[in-house]
């Protein structure tokens, strides 16, 4: 490409364009979360902790970690040692506790879910109570507290699901997306968003560690 008489490599231009777009996205995120009060359901999980770390790097006012794992909360509190962190012991199955935890919250990240596929296959209704009914509880609590935005952490397993886990995650996403249909803009400012990810390295429910172990065994043969 010729610009002002200079020949510039096209790949270089694409790199510069990507760099500018990436940094603009970072700036948008920084302003989006600045001064916000955030709650993360399932916040003691691997994804919840990674999200917490990223949010703490921004100028958030406070982050509430909502989970039923008391031991992990203690570990997480010791790990981060940040006065902006608050910890709530609770379960998404408990509507009343959710409503209390979401008081004055601006943004919710809903990461709480049962996700170990074999266990869920033998305990399907438990998965429904947490992943489906629990998600509806989160939606209702968000509406009651007039939360600005709620983000459901979905999964690629929800695409043409082959097991109970994928099916419940698909229902989670559908509940979040359809929640926007019955939100009265005159009464509620809440917006519900669903995002998807694949197998997360380091996640307790990820298949990645299994793949690594299989590769190691194959090498040792």
What do these predicted regions represent?
Residues 60-72:
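Conserved glycine-rich Rossmann-like NAD(P)H-binding loop of the short-chain dehydrogenase/reductase
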Residues 67, 89, 129:
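Conserved residues in the N-terminal Rossmann fold of short-chain dehydrogenase/reductase
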